[in-house]
Amino acid sequence: MFRAQCAALCLVLAALTSCAAPGARAAVLSISPADTTVQVGATFTLRVTCDAVSDLKGMQTAWGYSATRLQLVSMTAGNVFTDGGGAWFEHMIFDVSAPADTAWLDVAKLNGTAQGPGVAAYVRFKALVPGDAPVQCTLAEMRDSDNVSLLPGCSGGIVHVAAPTAITRRSWGQLKIHAR
């Protein structure tokens, strides 16, 4: 009797796992480059990349950053959603709580689906003061055309903001004397 119950339970579990959505699989979002150095005052762009996804309909993502070191300029949809024809929608959600330290983006393919790998979003920052500024994933949600979550994982990065180095002007003769 006990063996029959175990066998029945195993059959039910096997049936449930085989009935799961076939397109649903874990996806990964990551910041690229994961480690970069910029100068104070520079405006630069980080890419939010996604791995191979065959059926991507929409994404909501949020990335936390150091508001003392970085200022968010913009966050826009990447080529995963914008290339390949078809209409798409994007909406940058502004962080209204002080300090503004989160970049949010909703993006969806309106007709058809998107495919990865590629750039899912571009995040543009301005470097404010020297130091290390981690960029961390605080929210990642990706859905396929059946509205099934792709259960995305995500990994952040770090931006090293460097202070400008002073340039000393010397003539060739001064350099020769200084080097001796």
Predicted segment positions?
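Intrinsically disordered, low-complexity serine/threonine-rich segments
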Residues: Q5, A21-P22
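Positively charged n-region of N-terminal signal peptides that target proteins for export
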Residues: M1-A8
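Bacterial N-terminal signal peptides
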Residues: A8-S18
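Acidic, low-complexity intrinsically disordered segments
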Residues: P22-R180
